[in-house]
Amino acid sequence: MSQNKACDLCRLKKIKCSRGQPRCQTCTLFQADCHYSNRARRKRLVQRSKETFGGITLPVFDYAAGINGNEPEPSDHSIPNQENFALTTNGTISKNIEKPEDGEESVQRRLKLLEEKIDLLLDIATETSEFKRENKAIELPSLVTQIKDAESIVIKHRQGSPVDNTPTRILNVESLFPPQLPDWEKAFHDIPKKEVAHELVTSYFQHVNWWWPTFVYNDFMYEFERLYAFGFHSNNAWLISFYSILALSSIRKRLGNSKTLAESLFSTAWVFVQKSDFFLTPSIDKVQALIVMTQYAAYLSSSSLCRTLCGQACLMAQQLNLHRKQSTDVEPEKAESWKRIFWMCYILDKNISLIFGTPSVFNDKDIDCNLPDSKYELLFGVQSGGDLIFVPTVSLTIIQSEIRNRLYSVKSPTQMAAREKIIIPIHQKLKAWEENLPSEIKMYHEMLLNNTFSPTISLSDRFEFLTFAGMEVYFSYLNTLIILHRPSSSTENRRICINAAREAVQLLKNRLNIDLRVNVKADPLWIFLYCPFTPFLIIFNNLVHETDTETDSETLLNDLDLLHVIYDFFMEMEPVSDVALELVKIADKLLRVAKEVCSAKNNDVTDSTFKDIVEGFELNDLNSWDFDRVTNVMRNL
């Protein structure tokens, strides 16, 4: 005779049996023997089951001990003696009691058992929530996510503060990233004068294209001469690149009318993009045009334009198979140009997805493209040295993408121990990347960090080009360290984060104090304001949230000084970017909270001492800088 598919206890309780061995889940829960009876007539089986399992109930106290991690004491769940027990009407086994139990006592006893079960369920729920809180998934540290984290810290601080004068509402996403589209009415109807256009194009190749190589210099200038020779150009994609380059160069000059001029030039490029045939077929010229437009939108920190333009550029690059190895039949110069165009799309895609917390277009497992070859770097700029920045940036972006995929994705481990196993090898990759940086970049970094520059080096053109570029590389590296160690709660990882944040802000402070002219040549990606704001929040969190923060007045005042440096930087970027204006408001609220916390930790930290030690920096009026020659040229536009 065959056995039943469910054990006897599951059949009695009318529960689906898992048929596990040696005991199913139900029998394990009730700590009963798991027995499978042969198929028999239903009445006899039900009667025997009631007699056998009727008195089995959930062992509350033993189960609670199992939840707490202790071994439960063995319990006797054998069948009771039929002489001393009798079968009740509801199928349970009870002792033969001569006197029936009083009704009130029965209700109290049941209420007590109910309270015990509720307490047990609450204990289980509490332990489960604490376990999830300790091993929860880490959200991608986008700009909005970091500000929300800071907002939660402020709310927690305000709840324990007797005086509450600062509103806890810090972030308004709509005001931080408002939807912005170019205005068609501002577009140019005529081609700009050649002298003006040549000045702006040369500036772009000197300060942008040489270390973000998108165009071959000779090829672009050939098309430039054709435009002014014939008075028109038949390639709309090239015209989009042309007007976008003029707009980006104009806004980077930061003259009195540069913002209005840049908006008009970019609106002209936007008119050509809106033509119906632009997105129908992919081409190299269109990818280049979208890259420059993305750079302009990145300089203004326009989130909607950045995501749209960069996404279309990356999709076109994939359709053209730029992420694959090029055939040997392609000319080496052309293959190198296509390779660099792809890596430009890759860098933009990964940075924008990180800053705004959006999905990345490229899948790293699908990429089969070699790194740029430095022997071709002179094709893309008017001077050498660009690959000292571009090639390490590509390698660093690949590591950043690995960090995101392994620590911040849906499949990332939630246990802290598993995260540590991922963090250690990636940290070693980052240290190896830093050791393999070009010696010239390391030299500029050491001089910048220690605020020691020789007059000979400071007056050279190479210093002007490479110092800020090297600062951008190290700023990205320090932010990558923060992103890597941020998911871990260990003391060592927190120490790495706070040291990286302090070094990043110190770099910014020293650079802007040394030579204000280089500030004009700030990289568009860096002006996203994401890189400066990340160390700002790390230092703020260390001051306010952490309980083991150093409480000596010197350390607290130095950290407040660093926060004030970032605040001053946002103030100076306010005329360029609308996002900077919102970050100024956010930084001001956080800075006030940090001052209150530091004063509570150490009585020596007061407003007067803070004002004495904070040096800050105040940039000169940008309109008073020595750009008379360029100003006269732009006035003719």
From Swiss-Prot:
SUPFAM superfamilies the UniProt entry points to? Zn2/Cys6 DNA-binding domain (SSF57701)
What are the UniProt keywords, alphabetically? Answer: DNA-binding, Metal-binding, Nucleus, Transcription, Transcription regulation, Zinc, Zinc-finger
Q: Name one GO cellular component term.
A: nucleus
Q: Entry's Pfam families? A: Fungal_trans, Zn_clus
Q: Zinc finger (C2H2-type) locations?
A: 304-327
Mind telling me which CDD domains this protein's record contains? fungal_TF_MHR, GAL4
Q: Name one GO biological process term.
A: DNA-templated transcription
Compartments, as annotated in UniProt = Nucleus
Q: Name one GO molecular function term.
A: sequence-specific DNA binding
- Native species of this protein? Schizosaccharomyces pombe (strain 972 / ATCC 24843)
The answer, when asked if Transcription is one of the entry's keywords, is yes
Extract the PANTHER family matched here: TRANSCRIPTION FACTOR PDR1, ZN(II)2CYS6 TRANSCRIPTION FACTOR (EUROFUNG)
- Report what the protein is called: Uncharacterized transcriptional regulatory protein C11D3.07c
Q: Which residues bind DNA?
A: 7-34
The superkingdom of the source organism is Eukaryota
Q: Which InterPro entries match?
A: AtrR-like, Transcription_factor_dom_fun, Zn2-C6_fun-type_DNA-bd_sf, Zn2Cys6_DnaBD
